Amino acid sequence: MTILLTILASLLVFGAVIAVHEFGHFAAAKLSGIQVNEFAIGMGPALWKKIAGGTQYTLRLLPVGGYVAMEGEGSPESNQAERARDGQPEAAAENPIPPDQRTGIPFPEAAIWKRAIVMAAGPLMNFVLGFVVLVLVVATQQEVITSRVIYSIDEGALCGQTGLQAGDEIVAVNGRRCFVTNDILYELARTRDTQADFTVRRDGRLLELPGVRFDTYTGEDGGTRMNIGFTVYALARTPLNVLKESVNSELYYSRIIFTSLIDLLQGRESINNLSGPVGIVSAIGQAASYGLTDVVEMLVLITVNLGVFNLLPIPALDGGRLVFLGVEAVIRRPVSERLQENLTLATFILLFGLMIFATYNDVIRLFTGGL
């Protein structure tokens, strides 16, 4: 039962996140007057297909991928390679739309700003999905909306003895701006010792509180844990507070993804902690065992992760395509297609290698009880 629940939850999460991403590209291309030859959801053999409005809509067997085929996007060889990567049959490389039914212009003939919108629309839709889901969660499932204003400090707590006071509004921790309570907790969790520098608003003035210290306790695993030692005020569940909490929570998710990447590059986090598809599926399965709310929150994390990751300036990603378009706008001619293909292939191989390494980490943790 647990395995079945994990599979169903994973298909739901991955299917929703990828479908929304591809729909963003598709909708932007259509609105920009670009010919979309195929909009496919899923990978593998086609279960259903229909041509309407100059586009073939395809539903494929495995609901864990998607594809938007625009007229003139890349060379025939690169298009065939992309389709192979997305698990689509070689026969699909042929244009399914007869010339007299095509309603748009080829992708390269569209204005640069329109092509940029098409590339950015996929990640943007991931952020939109995350925001909509967060609004629903905050409005209906989240027990309480918390503020950043300290309500009380535990009696004898070190944080109260070293600077914090009831009524303080926490603005930043260790120089990093905090928008929601989770920002505060995240920054404290990243602290290497048991003290942190706070910026608070007290009586209308900003104050710097360096070296605020926290009590510690020993966890069940024998590790040292930080005891926060204070509580914050709750906010009324008004429409405005729900929207603000949803926006700030999405910023929080985006921020921890960026911060995790930076920590990885700076060596603060070991590359051995990198997790791949197996780890993600395992996390979704754990969330499913706790309930629907946890699965939905996992969906938010994954969709925001996909949005942020795809905007990175890496040639194999949407962000890399945006960089190529930016260069084209500056030099007033397209970047060499061969150069684009070579850079895309090189970074795709690198990303694929990282995924294999992360999957290896996941499998090791799975068999050693780390997942």
What spans do the regions from the language model cover?
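Small-residue-rich helix-interface/hinge motifs
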Residues: 3-95, 312-331
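PDZ peptide-recognition modules
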Residues: 4, 78-114, 118-121, 125-274, ...
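Alpha-helical transmembrane segments of integral membrane proteins
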Residues: 5-13, 301, 348-354
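Membrane-interacting alpha-helical segments
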Residues: 40, 65, 240-266, 278-281, ...
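Membrane interface segments of multi-pass transport proteins and intramembrane proteases
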Residues: 47-51, 149-153, 326-342, 369
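Transmembrane alpha-helix interface/packing and boundary motifs in multi-pass membrane proteins
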Residues: 263-267, 303-317
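Small-residue-enriched transmembrane helix starts and helix-helix packing motifs
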Residues: 291-308
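Juxtamembrane boundary at the C-terminal end of a transmembrane helix
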Residues: 357-371
